[in-house]
Amino acid sequence: PSGSTERTKSDSFHTFVVMDLMNGTEEHFQHTIKEELTISGAGIHTGQAVTMRLKPAEPNTGIQFQRIDLPEKTIIKADVDNVVETNRSTTLESNGARVSTIEHLMAALVGMQIDNILIELDGEEVPILDGSSEPFVQELKKVGTLKQNTPKIYYEIKHNITFIDEDKKVEMVALPYHDYRINTLIDFNSPVLGTQHADMKNIAVFNDQIASSRTFCFFHELEALLNNNLI
Protein backbone atom coordinates (compact mmCIF):
# COMPACT_ATOMS: atom_id res chain seq x y z
CA PRO A 1 0.00 0.00 0.00
CA SER A 2 1.07 3.59 -0.65
CA GLY A 3 1.71 6.24 1.97
CA SER A 4 4.00 6.42 4.98
CA THR A 5 4.66 3.11 6.70
CA GLU A 6 6.07 1.74 9.91
CA ARG A 7 7.78 -1.66 9.70
CA THR A 8 9.04 -4.42 11.93
CA LYS A 9 11.01 -7.43 10.71
CA SER A 10 11.07 -11.19 11.22
CA ASP A 11 12.85 -13.99 9.38
CA SER A 12 9.91 -14.51 6.98
CA PHE A 13 8.00 -11.26 6.66
CA HIS A 14 7.78 -7.53 7.26
CA THR A 15 4.93 -6.12 9.34
CA PHE A 16 3.79 -2.64 8.50
CA VAL A 17 0.91 -0.21 8.86
CA VAL A 18 -0.07 2.76 6.73
CA MET A 19 0.62 5.86 8.84
CA ASP A 20 -0.65 8.52 6.43
CA LEU A 21 -4.36 8.04 7.14
CA MET A 22 -5.37 11.28 5.45
CA ASN A 23 -4.20 9.86 2.12
CA GLY A 24 -5.02 6.23 2.85
CA THR A 25 -7.68 4.49 0.79
CA GLU A 26 -10.66 2.55 2.17
CA GLU A 27 -8.71 -0.72 2.15
CA HIS A 28 -6.04 0.73 4.46
CA PHE A 29 -8.49 1.07 7.37
CA GLN A 30 -9.92 -1.53 9.72
CA HIS A 31 -13.66 -2.26 9.48
CA THR A 32 -16.41 -3.66 11.69
CA ILE A 33 -20.17 -4.04 11.17
CA LYS A 34 -22.52 -1.10 11.67
CA GLU A 35 -24.96 -2.91 13.93
CA GLU A 36 -25.68 -6.25 15.57
CA LEU A 37 -27.29 -9.08 13.63
CA THR A 38 -28.59 -12.55 14.49
CA ILE A 39 -28.25 -15.77 12.46
CA SER A 40 -29.79 -19.10 13.46
CA GLY A 41 -29.55 -22.59 12.03
CA ALA A 42 -28.31 -26.14 12.61
CA GLY A 43 -24.77 -27.46 12.62
CA ILE A 44 -24.02 -29.91 9.81
CA HIS A 45 -21.93 -32.23 12.00
CA THR A 46 -23.72 -31.98 15.37
CA GLY A 47 -27.24 -31.41 14.03
CA GLN A 48 -27.80 -29.04 16.96
CA ALA A 49 -29.67 -25.76 16.63
CA VAL A 50 -27.55 -22.69 17.34
CA THR A 51 -28.09 -18.95 17.38
CA MET A 52 -25.25 -16.54 16.64
CA ARG A 53 -25.18 -12.85 17.46
CA LEU A 54 -22.62 -10.89 15.46
CA LYS A 55 -21.66 -7.64 17.16
CA PRO A 56 -19.50 -4.64 16.22
CA ALA A 57 -16.08 -4.61 17.88
CA GLU A 58 -13.42 -2.01 18.63
CA PRO A 59 -10.32 -1.57 16.43
CA ASN A 60 -7.61 -4.21 16.88
CA THR A 61 -10.11 -6.66 18.41
CA GLY A 62 -9.86 -9.06 15.50
CA ILE A 63 -12.41 -11.83 14.94
CA GLN A 64 -13.52 -13.41 18.20
CA PHE A 65 -16.03 -16.14 19.05
CA GLN A 66 -17.72 -16.35 22.46
CA ARG A 67 -19.47 -19.45 23.83
CA ILE A 68 -22.24 -17.77 25.82
CA ASP A 69 -23.77 -21.18 26.63
CA LEU A 70 -20.81 -22.02 28.86
CA PRO A 71 -20.52 -20.76 32.47
CA GLU A 72 -17.18 -19.10 31.71
CA LYS A 73 -18.52 -17.53 28.48
CA THR A 74 -15.11 -18.24 26.99
CA ILE A 75 -13.80 -16.05 24.17
CA ILE A 76 -11.97 -17.90 21.39
CA LYS A 77 -9.85 -15.83 19.04
CA ALA A 78 -9.84 -16.71 15.35
CA ASP A 79 -6.11 -17.38 15.38
CA VAL A 80 -4.20 -20.16 13.65
CA ASP A 81 -2.63 -21.04 17.00
CA ASN A 82 -6.10 -22.00 18.26
CA VAL A 83 -6.83 -24.45 15.42
CA VAL A 84 -7.10 -27.97 16.88
CA GLU A 85 -8.90 -29.91 14.14
CA THR A 86 -9.35 -29.72 10.36
CA ASN A 87 -11.14 -32.99 9.58
CA ARG A 88 -13.95 -31.92 7.19
CA SER A 89 -14.19 -28.60 9.04
CA THR A 90 -12.09 -26.18 11.06
CA THR A 91 -12.29 -26.21 14.86
CA LEU A 92 -10.86 -23.62 17.25
CA GLU A 93 -10.24 -24.21 20.95
CA SER A 94 -9.24 -21.97 23.86
CA ASN A 95 -9.28 -22.81 27.58
CA GLY A 96 -11.26 -25.98 26.91
CA ALA A 97 -14.00 -24.26 24.88
CA ARG A 98 -14.48 -25.10 21.21
CA VAL A 99 -16.16 -23.59 18.17
CA SER A 100 -16.35 -25.63 14.97
CA THR A 101 -17.20 -25.39 11.26
CA ILE A 102 -16.11 -21.76 11.17
CA GLU A 103 -14.78 -21.76 7.61
CA HIS A 104 -17.81 -20.44 5.69
CA LEU A 105 -18.39 -17.61 8.16
CA MET A 106 -14.68 -16.77 8.19
CA ALA A 107 -14.64 -16.69 4.39
CA ALA A 108 -17.60 -14.29 4.40
CA LEU A 109 -15.85 -11.99 6.88
CA VAL A 110 -12.69 -11.94 4.77
CA GLY A 111 -14.72 -11.40 1.61
CA MET A 112 -16.52 -8.47 3.24
CA GLN A 113 -13.13 -7.23 4.56
CA ILE A 114 -14.35 -7.15 8.17
CA ASP A 115 -11.47 -6.99 10.64
CA ASN A 116 -13.17 -6.63 14.02
CA ILE A 117 -16.25 -8.53 15.19
CA LEU A 118 -17.54 -10.47 18.21
CA ILE A 119 -19.57 -13.60 17.42
CA GLU A 120 -21.62 -14.96 20.31
CA LEU A 121 -22.86 -18.55 20.01
CA ASP A 122 -25.14 -20.64 22.24
CA GLY A 123 -23.60 -23.86 20.93
CA GLU A 124 -20.36 -25.32 19.62
CA GLU A 125 -20.95 -25.36 15.87
CA VAL A 126 -21.56 -22.49 13.45
CA PRO A 127 -24.80 -23.17 11.50
CA ILE A 128 -24.28 -24.59 8.02
CA LEU A 129 -27.24 -22.74 6.41
CA ASP A 130 -27.13 -23.64 2.68
CA GLY A 131 -23.58 -25.02 2.82
CA SER A 132 -21.89 -21.89 1.44
CA SER A 133 -20.71 -18.46 2.56
CA GLU A 134 -23.42 -16.64 0.63
CA PRO A 135 -26.09 -16.46 3.37
CA PHE A 136 -23.52 -14.96 5.74
CA VAL A 137 -22.48 -12.42 3.10
CA GLN A 138 -26.10 -11.42 2.49
CA GLU A 139 -26.78 -10.90 6.20
CA LEU A 140 -23.60 -8.86 6.61
CA LYS A 141 -24.56 -6.71 3.63
CA LYS A 142 -27.90 -5.91 5.28
CA VAL A 143 -26.24 -4.23 8.27
CA GLY A 144 -23.28 -2.85 6.31
CA THR A 145 -19.68 -2.23 7.33
CA LEU A 146 -18.18 0.68 9.26
CA LYS A 147 -14.76 2.15 8.54
CA GLN A 148 -12.72 2.64 11.70
CA ASN A 149 -10.07 5.33 12.03
CA THR A 150 -7.34 2.77 12.66
CA PRO A 151 -4.90 1.44 10.05
CA LYS A 152 -4.78 -2.22 9.15
CA ILE A 153 -1.69 -4.26 9.90
CA TYR A 154 -0.13 -5.77 6.77
CA TYR A 155 2.23 -8.72 6.44
CA GLU A 156 4.65 -8.69 3.52
CA ILE A 157 6.62 -11.91 3.08
CA LYS A 158 10.30 -11.67 2.15
CA HIS A 159 10.80 -15.09 0.54
CA ASN A 160 8.88 -18.19 -0.51
CA ILE A 161 7.11 -20.05 2.30
CA THR A 162 6.00 -23.65 1.67
CA PHE A 163 3.66 -25.87 3.71
CA ILE A 164 3.13 -29.54 2.83
CA ASP A 165 0.81 -32.05 4.50
CA GLU A 166 1.69 -35.45 3.06
CA ASP A 167 -1.22 -37.25 4.75
CA LYS A 168 -3.85 -34.93 3.28
CA LYS A 169 -1.92 -34.40 0.04
CA VAL A 170 -1.99 -30.64 0.44
CA GLU A 171 0.70 -28.18 -0.60
CA MET A 172 0.57 -24.41 -0.09
CA VAL A 173 3.18 -21.93 -1.29
CA ALA A 174 3.22 -18.22 -0.43
CA LEU A 175 5.32 -16.05 -2.75
CA PRO A 176 6.41 -12.42 -2.45
CA TYR A 177 4.17 -10.37 -4.74
CA HIS A 178 3.39 -6.70 -5.30
CA ASP A 179 -0.37 -7.31 -5.34
CA TYR A 180 -3.09 -9.68 -4.11
CA ARG A 181 -3.47 -13.04 -5.86
CA ILE A 182 -4.64 -16.53 -4.91
CA ASN A 183 -4.13 -19.41 -7.33
CA THR A 184 -5.63 -22.81 -6.49
CA LEU A 185 -5.58 -26.25 -8.09
CA ILE A 186 -7.47 -29.29 -6.81
CA ASP A 187 -7.86 -32.84 -8.09
CA PHE A 188 -10.57 -35.03 -6.53
CA ASN A 189 -9.39 -38.09 -8.48
CA SER A 190 -12.93 -38.46 -9.77
CA PRO A 191 -14.31 -38.67 -13.33
CA VAL A 192 -17.24 -36.54 -12.14
CA LEU A 193 -15.18 -33.49 -11.17
CA GLY A 194 -11.63 -34.10 -12.31
CA THR A 195 -9.10 -31.30 -11.89
CA GLN A 196 -10.32 -27.79 -11.10
CA HIS A 197 -8.42 -24.51 -11.18
CA ALA A 198 -9.24 -21.00 -9.98
CA ASP A 199 -7.33 -17.71 -9.91
CA MET A 200 -8.46 -14.74 -7.78
CA LYS A 201 -6.72 -11.40 -8.26
CA ASN A 202 -8.99 -9.20 -6.15
CA ILE A 203 -10.80 -10.06 -2.90
CA ALA A 204 -13.66 -7.82 -4.09
CA VAL A 205 -14.83 -10.60 -6.45
CA PHE A 206 -15.41 -13.01 -3.55
CA ASN A 207 -19.04 -12.06 -2.91
CA ASP A 208 -20.17 -12.51 -6.52
CA GLN A 209 -17.91 -15.31 -7.74
CA ILE A 210 -16.93 -17.48 -4.76
CA ALA A 211 -19.36 -17.04 -1.84
CA SER A 212 -21.98 -19.35 -3.38
CA SER A 213 -19.59 -22.33 -3.58
CA ARG A 214 -21.09 -25.11 -1.47
CA THR A 215 -19.87 -27.98 0.66
CA PHE A 216 -20.30 -31.43 -0.89
CA CYS A 217 -19.15 -34.99 -0.39
CA PHE A 218 -18.97 -38.13 -2.53
CA PHE A 219 -21.34 -41.02 -1.95
CA HIS A 220 -18.44 -43.33 -1.11
CA GLU A 221 -17.41 -40.99 1.73
CA LEU A 222 -20.71 -41.27 3.60
CA GLU A 223 -19.86 -44.43 5.56
CA ALA A 224 -16.61 -42.96 6.88
CA LEU A 225 -18.37 -39.71 7.82
CA LEU A 226 -21.08 -41.62 9.69
CA ASN A 227 -18.53 -43.81 11.49
CA ASN A 228 -16.66 -40.72 12.67
CA ASN A 229 -19.82 -38.89 13.79
CA LEU A 230 -19.28 -36.15 11.21
CA ILE A 231 -22.84 -36.34 9.88
Stretch-by-stretch model annotation:
Residues 11-231:
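Short acidic-hydrophobic catalytic motif
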